[in-house]
Amino acid sequence: MLRFQTAGESHGEALVATLTGVPAGLPIDQAFLDRELWRRQQGFGRGGRMKIERDTAHILSGVHHGKTIGSPIAILIRNNDWKNWQESLPVEEGDSAKHKPVKSPRPGHADLAGALKYNFPEARYVLERASARETTARVAAGAIAKLLLRQIGADVLSHVIAVGTARLENTEVQWEKLVELAQRDNVLLGCVDPEAEQRMKEQVDQVLRTGDTVGGVFEVVAHNLPPGLGTYVEWDRRLDGLLAMAVMSLQAVKAVEIGEGVSVAATFGSGAQDEIGYEREHESKFTGFTRTSNHAGGIEGGVSNGQDILVRGYLKPISTLRRPLGSVDFATREPLKAAYERSDVCVVPAAGIAAEAMVAITLAGCALEKFGGDSLVEFKRNYEGYCQQLQSF
């Protein structure tokens, strides 16, 4: 069983991720982990925080001599901005006069609901943990999950489909385009089509001028996974349900779509399914079964079917505005503009990277459930045996 947790606050000393259940013997590429963290920081419309942080994964346990040892992996990512918050957010009891309270909750954020739930007089501690800065730790854990998936020839990448009303017209993107996109060192908005990306940039430029924010849509693609991950026999093990929960857990994601789930709801059954064929002479490592389309997004009945798995996340515009909306003062209950905290304008590309991590962790967990193995050797041997079973079906 693969489990992960994160800890840390936005302006605390560091963020921590723990990952339990990774087989022993998995090679860990430090440069790859740091590259994934770098990818999360990119994109036009990010705020000033990204100029401060230089995220690097410091592995504290579970890895020696470049390979996992089967014990829990702990990863630490330091917050450079902590030096500016040490006195206002001390671990021990400090000078309350240096505390920076969030006096008026921001509509759309966790501020008010969190303060009510945990009985805080204001929202500083809610903001610190609810912040999307937490996804840094998720991306670090997701990088290790990706390394495990790569051992069986699979990978997970993302691209941006829409920012505001600007949209990629042809969303059937070849895997090679996503690989090329992930290798770029100059990232604008994470779209494979330069013309569509410029239209998206215009949307961000507009909200930069007006003090607003903008949301959008990203798509995560999981490539070259075998059929048979997940199951239909129990509701809480269905793969599409697990992926939806994983992506929906990301800050500001308000809807999740598997495949063409939204558009097929407006069509008829005869046009919504992916017809099945068979090639007796094929090069697939899995089976000779083929499909004419991928409306299902690679999942049928809660089980992967061997096609690319497609997961879309719909991101609302983030809640912190330079022109704040109406709110109330926590102390007086009188009208007061919502608090402003240094923030981003558009985070759709970064959300896509965080979603990659969540999808990779989910799929790696399903792969471990299917194939088992306390060591990488055992895991891969079981996978190869399953592939042989598929070939002889």
Swiss-Prot record:
EC number: 4.2.3.5
Domain of life: Bacteria
Cofactor: how bound: Reduced FMN (FMNH(2)).
GO CC terms of this entry: cytosol
SUPFAM superfamilies, A to Z: Chorismate synthase, AroC (SSF103263)
GO biological process: amino acid biosynthetic process; aromatic amino acid family biosynthetic process; chorismate biosynthetic process
Keywords, in A-Z order: Amino-acid biosynthesis, Aromatic amino acid biosynthesis, FAD, Flavoprotein, FMN, Lyase, NADP
Pathway assigned in UniProt: Metabolic intermediate biosynthesis; chorismate biosynthesis; chorismate from D-erythrose 4-phosphate and phosphoenolpyruvate: step 7/7
GO molecular function terms noted in the UniProt entry: chorismate synthase activity; FMN binding
Enzyme class: lyase
Residues the record lists as binding FMN: R129, A130, S131, Q251, A252, G301, K316, P317, I318, S319, T320, R342
Residues reported in the UniProt entry to bind NADP(+): R40, R46
Assembly and oligomerization: Homotetramer.
Role summary: This reaction introduces a second double bond into the aromatic ring system.
Family: Belongs to the chorismate synthase family.
Identification of the protein by name: Chorismate synthase
Organism: Koribacter versatilis (strain Ellin345)
